[in-house]
């Protein structure tokens, strides 16, 4: 029987067998070639370190109801993205064929039976590892579009994981003339500098908000992106942003 990676309790992962469902006319069967987790959000969920683990989500109000039980036994599949190869095609599927490389937001398991319209074809010549970055790139692009980066803007990015690094690069493509990156991890700051930021600050050794204000003639950043999910970073991002500026929070 095929296997999948699941969490049966906070912080504990196991391999579990499962039975694959019959193939419906609009579905395809996919054999996994490469899968990945989401380093930030998913690992916090794996550790039960998010409101999803303690407070019931109200889909109508779009908020967590504090103190109300989720009724969740915690059992959940792990994994965020998967690249695979189509091995079977339903009778009504015309968009895909056997041997196509496809990818989607899917958990870590050996096979997937899924509607064809939920899958995207993988471009030729693109590695599985690169395709896994489709997810953070999607969030980064959405953040930069929400921030409405314009030609000549001064931009600050707090949190230099994959999303933050891509936000900085997308902001430059959007016309930002000066970009400062903030993260306590040295190798992340160095990566930001290699990819085009003008300055990288360590918030554990400097007052990032104060320094950025001073570096911008006491004005601050026109647009600030907070991608780390840290309350301290969010506070620093607020202090960094200029009067009537824009702060985009992308973290969960």
Which role fits each region the language model picked out?
Residues 127-205, 210, 244:
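Mid-domain Rossmann-like dinucleotide-binding core that forms the NAD(H)/NADP(H) cofactor-binding site
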Residues 77, 105-116:
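A structural motif shared across PLP-dependent enzymes of the aminotransferase-like
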Residues 72-105:
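A glycine-/small-residue-rich N-terminal strand-loop-strand element
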Residues 106, 183, 251:
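Conserved acidic E/D residue at the C-terminus of a beta-strand in Rossmann-like folds
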Residues 195-252:
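Glycine-rich cofactor phosphate-binding loops and adjacent beta1-alpha1 units
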Residues 1-75:
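Short N-terminal strand-loop motif that marks the start
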